[in-house]
Swiss-Prot record:
Residues 92-152, 170-191 are annotated as: Disordered. The keyword Kinase does not apply. Gene3D superfamilies: Complement Module, domain 1 (2.10.70.10), Spermadhesin, CUB domain (2.60.120.290). GO terms for biological process: synapse maturation. Residues 866-910 are cytoplasmic. It comes from Bos taurus (Bovine). This is Seizure 6-like protein 2. The chain crosses the membrane at residues 845-865.
Amino acid sequence: MGTPRAQHPPPPQLLFLFLLSCPWIQGLPLKEEEALPEPGSETPTVASEALAELLHGALLRKGPEMGYLPGSDPDPTLATPPVGQTIAAPFLPRATEPGTGPLTTAVTPKGGRGAGPTAPELLTPPPGTTAPPLPGPASPGPPLGPEGGEEETTTTIITTTTVTTTVTSPVLCNNNISEGEGHVESPDLGSSTSRTLGLLDCTYSIHVYPGYGIEIQVQMLNLSREEELLVLAGGGSPGLAPRLLANSSMLGEGQVLRSPTNRLLLHFQSPRVPRGAGFRIHYQAYLLSCGFPPQPAHGDVSVTDLHPGGTATFHCDSGYQLQGEETLVCLNGTRPAWSSEPPSCMASCGGTIHNATLGRIVSPEPGGAAGPNLTCRWVIEAAEGRRLHLHFERVSLDEDNDRLMVRSGGSPLSPVIYDSDMDDVPERGLISDAQSLYVELLSETPANPLLLSLRFEAFEEDRCFAPFLAHGNVTTTDPEYRPGALATFSCLPGYALEPPGPPNVIECVDPTEPHWNDTEPACKAMCGGELSEPAGVVLSPDWPQSYSPGQDCVWGLHVQEEKRILLQVEILNVREGDMLTLFDGDGPSARVLAQLRGPQPRRRLLSSGSDLTLQFQAPPGPPNPGLGQGFVLHFKEVPRNDTCPELPPPEWGWRTASHGDLIRGTVLTYQCEPGYELLGSDILTCQWDLSWSAAPPACQKIMTCADPGEITNGHRTTSDAGFPVGSHVQYRCLPGYSLEGAAVLTCYSRDTGTPKWSDRVPKCALKYEPCLNPGVPENGYQTLYKHHYQAGESLRFFCYEGFELIGEVTITCVPGHPSQWTSQPPLCKVTQTTDPSRQLEGGNLALAILLPLGLVIILGSGVYIYYTKLQGKSLFGFSGSHSYSPITVESDFSNPLYEAGDTREYEVSI
C-alpha cells in the first residue's frame, strides 16, 4: 500500500455550507422553510430575518465551482423567488418543476457509490414535501493515486448542494374601487416584484351606489398574446354571478362598455414578464334606468321617466279591461325594476255597463280563462231618455257552434231584435226601443276562431244616432244630428264604398221619430281594381280580416308617363300556396318583377315604367280564416331617374346643393336674405325613396325688432311685447337719475335689412347741477369752451407766449348740489427776468444789428438817386428808351409790310 496522499482542505465555501447544514444552527429558516415561530417562542428578531435574507442571497450567488445535481435549474436566480413569495404551478416551465431536496452533504467512499444508510437518508426529501427522492451523486472520476497504483484507502469528502424550487402562488394585485369616476391602469411593470416573478393575477373591483351602472372606455390597450384581460359585470351579491362583457380579443382602444349593475370586475393575468405597454381604462358611473315597459295587446302605455321614480301608466282600448296594476313605478336598486309585472288588456266575458255613452263589446280570446266553451252576457244601460244604437263592426261566427242574440231591454226575457241563427248581420245596425240592450254570446268548441266586435252609442230620442263608418270618414252638416242633418261618407285609401256609387249621403228625417233615410255604407278592401292616383294603398281582400280562399285579384297601378312607381311592402303574411306576383308593366303579360310567398319582411320595389300590375292568387280550399293574414302595400310615383324632384329656391333667399344632380344623399342648405327669416328646416336630404326629408322652407320678412332690453336705474313701457314694426318703447329713470338719450324708441322697417330701433337705448345717470364756465384767464385761453359742464367733465387752461401759468392746468367738475370745480381757474402772468444787465445786453445787440442795416439802406438809396436823377441813366436797363443808336439792317424783301419788322435793335451793355 502506498503512502497516503495528503488531503487538501475543502474550499471556504464548502465549509461554510457544511456549517449551515449542522443541526446546532437553530432559528435560521432556509428558502423552502416557513419562518414561523414555534408555539411559545418569541417572534424572530430583525437580526434573524436579515440573516435569513443573507443566507438566501448566498444561495443565489453560488458560482460555477459549485456543481449542480442533475435536474436542477441551470439558473437559480430565475427559478428561485425571494423569500416568502410563491409561484403558481400552472405558469412554471417544465425545467423548474420540483425535483430537488434541501441542502445536503454526503460522504462517499472511493467506490463512488453511496454506502450505508447515511447516503439515502440525506438525499431523501423531508416529510411533507412534494419533491421526489433525488438520485445519488454522480460516480467519481478516476482514482486520485498515480497511474497503475494501488487503491487508496483514504476517502474524499464530496459536498453536493442543490437548489429547491417550491410551487408557489402568483403575485396578487387586487384593488377595490368605490369612486364614481377614475382610471384603472395595468400594474407597474418596473417594480422589483414584477421584474423578478413576471407573474400577475390582478382583480380590480369597481362598485358604485345602487341605481347606478358603470361605463368604461378603453383608452389604451397593448397586451401580448399570453396576457388576458376580462371585463365582467355583476357579482358581489348572493345569486348574482358575474357576467362576461368582453375579453382581450373583443376589446379595442376607444371602445365603450356598460355594466347593467353597480359592480364591475376587471381581471388581468400575465403568465410571464409582460412585454406590452399594458392597459388604461377610464370608468364613470351613470344612472341606471328601467326598461321600457311592453305595450299591452289592445292597449297603450305612457311613461313619465325611465329612471328611478318614474311612472308608467297603462290604458286599454274600448271593449277591454285592464288586468293588473294601472300605474307602475321604477324602483331603485342594483338593477332598477318596475314595481310589479306589466298588466294586460283582456276582453271580459259579460258584464254590465252603466250610463253607457260610447264603447265596444269584444269577444274574449279563444282558449283563455273561459275555455273553449263560452257563455257571455252583457247588459248595456244608457241614461234616462236615451236609446242605444248597436253597430256590427266585425262578426265571424261558426254557424254550427256559435250563436249571438240581442234583446231590446235589460233582461233575458226582453224581446229579441237579432238572432244569428235566423237573421243576417244588419248593415245599418240595431236600435233599441228602450234605454237598455241585452247581448248574449254562446260558443261551444267552435271549429273556427271566434271574432266579435260590436260598437254601441247612446243618443237622444229626438235625434238620429251618430253614423259610423269603419275604415272611413263621416262629415255632417249638424254635429247634433237633428232632423234635416246630412252625413257624407268617404273611405280611407285602399278601401271602396260598398255598395259602390251613391248613396254616399244620408239624411236624418221624421222629427216625430228621427231616423236616417238610408243605411250607412261600408268601406271594404276590394279584390282588384284600377288605381291611377299619384299615391295609394293596395290591401288584400276584406282587410283587416283574413281573405277567403279562391281569390284571383288583379290591380293595375298607373302614374304619369314621365314617372315610375315605388312599391313598399309593409305587411305580407299569406297562407302557404298563395302568391302575390308583380308585373313590371301594364297587364300580366309584362315582365315579372317579383313573386312573393308566405311571410315576408318589409321591402321596396321600383318599376321601370309608369305601369305596374299586381296579381294575387289564393287557390280554393277549405276555409281557414286566420287573424292578420293578408297584405298591405303602399305605392307612389317617383321620377324615372335616380334623383329627387327639383325644388325651386325660396323667394327672398337661396339654396346650395352638395351635388350637382339631386341624387340620393344630396343635401340642400337654405338661407334667407337680410331682413328675412327661414320658416322650416334649413337642411333637406334626398332619401332612398327619392323623396325629400322635409317640406321646402320659406323666407318670411322679419317684421319685428329685437328686444332693446331694460336699463339700469330705470324702467320701460312697451306698446307691444312682440316689438312689431311701429311699436314704441318708452324709458323712464328712477328718482335722482336723469335720462341721457332718447326717451322713446320706435321700431321702423327697412327695405334691405331687419327692422331697427329709431335710436340707441338711453342711460340713466345721476342727476347733478352742471358747473358754470369759470371764465378765461387774462392772457390765456381754454379748450372745449362752453357755458355748462356736466359732472365729471374736465377743463384745461393754457397761457400765451411770454406768460406763465399760475395754478392748476386742469380742473374737473365734481358732482354735488351744486356741482363745483376742483379748484379755482389759474392765472397767466408775464414772464420776469432776474438780471437787468441782460436787458441792456439785449438792447445793445438789437442796436448792433439795426444800425448797419440802416446805413446799407441809406447808401443804396443815394446811389439809386444819383444814377437816375443826376446822370439820366437807368441803373438796371428796364426803361423803354435807350441811350444807344439803333443798328439798321436792310431787308432783301421789298414788301413794305415787313420793312418795320426787319429793323432790329441791339443793346450792348458794358
